[in-house]
Amino acid sequence: MSEDHGKDYTLESDSELRFEIEQKDAKVLVSLVSGFAELFGTELVKKKQYEFGVGAKVAIFTYQGCVLHVSGKMDVCYISKETPMVQYVNCHAALEQFRMEAEEKDRYGPVAMVVGPMDVGKSTLCRILLNYAVRVGRRPLYADLDVGQGSIAISGSVATILIERPANVEEGFAKTAPLVYHFGHKSPSGNSVLYNAVVSKMAEVTLQSLNSNKRTKSSGIIINTCGWVKGSGYAHLLHAAKAYGACAIFVLDQERLYNELLRDVPKEVHVVLLPKSGGVVERSKELRHEARDQRIKEYFYGNARAPFYPFSFEVKFQDLRLYKIGAPPLPDSCMPIGMKAEDNKTKVVAVTPTPALIHHVLALSFAESVEDDVIGTNVAGFCCVTEVDMERQAVMLLSPQPRPLPPNALLLWSELQFMDNHT
């Protein structure tokens, strides 16, 4: 580990400075002294100081050369000339060509999926492509189908947002008015039938929303996906590509997946194999769990720059309308006539509060009744069960909004848990 109290790094054209921060409470300050540089597609402002904290894995790239001043404790810090950024900008140029044609003919802009195994930089490539699109005046939609490590909403959900300005260097994209659908599991394998149903619904609504604004219509959609690419995971990728009508699929770092997609998607879909960045870091299960936990914590409490102050309040069992999507499997012989085993996977069933509910995250659905299309209805937000009192027949909820819950509030169970030890 190196302790760096301040050093200038001179980068040649088409190179990048990479650093990682793993120590808790460590922070690194970066400023652009001269030249031009960007972080995942967002331009750095000259002389402005940017702060990065624990968990940051940063790659600052320059097309023309620059000088960066860096200070603070880093676990790794080096300059690399081996970077795939030129290939990534070529992908942006190809998408921009599609957008110009779509604009002329009043058609939908390109729908591009980014796919690949875990830890190859899928969400980073999405961020780069979205930033480049916004910088040339586009307003693309960003759809995140990664229920394990989602970057828009918390894990266990899929979501879409409109991108109107480049991502903040330190905090990423503004998550204003996201369209969020509840899934309730950390992997599509938790309920494959439900996952496909939720993806189909979000694709339908997202494609319809393109018609609401001419600029967004021609700007298209960038889609991030899960890192599960074999067996059923691969089937989910094919399902998503069909549901969204993808015209381009960018495959990161896996020739096998690239060749399978070439074989299985329609010939008019452009499938492109891209290298991953050498700066991509493989994450352990523990790190993935920590990242999920951090996303939930930030949902309720914000961060140091923009803290939130959530509310805790009690709800009686009798006022709690709590449901789960997916009933336990039944043998075919026990199924009602005309009902298939898959139907059970999307059945909405009531949940009786027990002590096992503690720490579980619940989604607040916009659906008002189980008679509504609960799966196809987006969610307003999330709360967390911090206490279950069987004697008093009540639960304590942690919520971004004060009491009471909205009238006819319908809460959906999730396997995600959050230990609220915030002080």
From Swiss-Prot:
Where is ATP bound in this sequence?
A: 16, 57, 119-124
Residues forming coiled coils: none
GO MF term set? ATP binding; polynucleotide 5'-hydroxyl-kinase activity
Where found, per UniProt?
A: Nucleus
One GO cellular component term:
mRNA cleavage factor complex
| Family affiliation | Belongs to the Clp1 family. Clp1 subfamily.
Tell me the function of this protein.
Answer: Required for endonucleolytic cleavage during polyadenylation-dependent pre-mRNA 3'-end formation.
Protein name in the entry = Protein CLP1 homolog
Which gene holds the coding sequence for this protein?
A: cbc
